[in-house]
Amino acid sequence: MLSLIVACLVLPLICYKLVRSYNQSREDEQFAASKGCQPPRKWSAKWPLGLDMLVKAVRYEKRQQILQLFLEEVAASGSTFEQNLLFARGIDTVEPRNIEAILSTQFTGSGIFTQDGPQWKHSRELLRPQFMTNRFRNFEQIRHAVNNLISSVPDSGVVDLQPLFFRLTFETTLFLLFGHYLPSLKSEGITGHESQFANAFNLGQDYLAQRGRLGDLYWLLGGREFKDACKVCHDFIDNAVQKALKHSSREKKVSDEEKETYVFIDALVQETREPSVLRDQCLNILLAGRDTTACCLTWTLRLLVQHPDVLSKLRDEVRDTIGMGPDAPDPTISQVKKLSYLSLVIKEVLRLYPSVPVNSRAAVKTTTLPTGGGPDGSAPLLVRRGEAVGYCVYAMHRRKDIYGPDADCFRPERWENDALKDVGYGYLPFNGGPRICLGQEFALLEVGYTVVRLLQTFETIEEAETKVPGAPLGEEKQTLTLVVSSGEGCWVSMKKGTK
């Protein structure tokens, strides 16, 4: 009797699901036909469920060359293709027209590929004044943090700059969030365990990156190590959030300068006093501000020491424009912005090593992409509700049909005389459309100023002699989380100039 009752309850539900799925499939087919959509190419997987691609991804990740797999798959499957992995269908693309559609045109307004709608827009408006009204204070903090970095270089002159760059951007991003220098944050008990936090933050990102590649089966990865890392990160930020909440609860007199200063956490506290919301917002900003800029600095110095001709040309520009040596003046904001060759160098670094090399959006309703369907890839293609579209900026920035036969090479001169002014969405160092990075001007200033000060202070900057010789560009070990950092560090030999 019980089994009969269960059958009577379950069978109608199964029938309902099947009918609903069938009707949805018919609606999708009709929608696709009305838009002229055709099926995209399939990816190169040979095993059921794409398991061979998963095995290959694990192998490449162990070698710390996962982005090389992306390049190979684009070469094998084309600029836009369909992937089927573990029962989930998705689209991958490195086609600028498709990425533009995802980020700015038909996928905006109605909420396509955005998960947080009005909340995201409101958070963005809260952050905008930090970069619009605090330019001078932000620049002063960059100067302060760069001086700390320079003083951290050991007397031997042989140093891995990558962790120092992460420390630098950690300082400046904490300032953006909380409005204090790192020493004053320490005195308030907010910091003091930066290394522990950094290790946990990095470990958490490693797990998130691997879980993301498993799609709906992300829960297979986790465990105590991941939970402990999350707790360390949460505790670190929660301490600062509690300080801000207590600060906002006390009535006190403030100076005119303090009234004019915009502090992100203070503005956020005026909107919500929910600690978990405040923590999540701060962690988002910390990731965007610390990791992306630190990685850009790391790749910039690696590429400069690997290309002495470019480094020499950049030194000449700094010497002629600002001056070199211990008696040279610190560059101003306007001077950094006027260094045209430095701008070309940073552009080229961000082309080869974009801050966020892989990204994706999930469709909240059935829609289309403008190209990638049909045998020649010129027809529109269907993207069903819930399906993800991944786009690999790292691979797109290496397309030879966009950047020429030497697209894999580091050549800042390719940007001279606006030679690539029409590249459009083929160049996305800071995303695009409504979600373009608010902090890009600050990040470029931070990178540019740091590079100039290093060149002014150290008369020689060369590749350090290590046991393992440096790999060719693009074949080095990389660590891919939400950003791409160097798996080999940034080992250099530096010698300070004399008066």
UniProtKB/Swiss-Prot annotation:
Which top class of enzyme applies to this chain? Answer: oxidoreductase
**Glycosylated residues (UniProt):** 23
**Keyword terms, alphabetized:** Glycoprotein, Heme, Iron, Metal-binding, Monooxygenase, Oxidoreductase, Signal
S-S bridge residues: none
> Which EC number(s) are documented for this chain?
1.14.14.-
Q: Where in the sequence is the signal peptide annotated?
A: 1-21
Question: Which InterPro entries does the record match to this protein?
Answer: Cyt_P450, Cyt_P450_CS, Cyt_P450_E_CYP52_fungi, Cyt_P450_E_grp-I, Cyt_P450_sf
Stretches of the chain forming a coiled coil according to its record: none
Reply yes or no: does the keyword Protein transport apply: no
Named cofactor requirement(s): heme
Q: Which GO terms describe its molecular function?
A: heme binding; iron ion binding; monooxygenase activity; oxidoreductase activity, acting on paired donors, with incorporation or reduction of molecular oxygen
The residues that the entry says bind heme are 437
Per the record, the similarity remark reads: Belongs to the cytochrome P450 family.
What does the UniProt record say this protein does?
Together with an NADPH cytochrome P450 the enzyme system catalyzes the terminal hydroxylation as the first step in the assimilation of alkanes and fatty acids.
Protein's name according to its UniProt entry: Cytochrome P450 ARB_01131
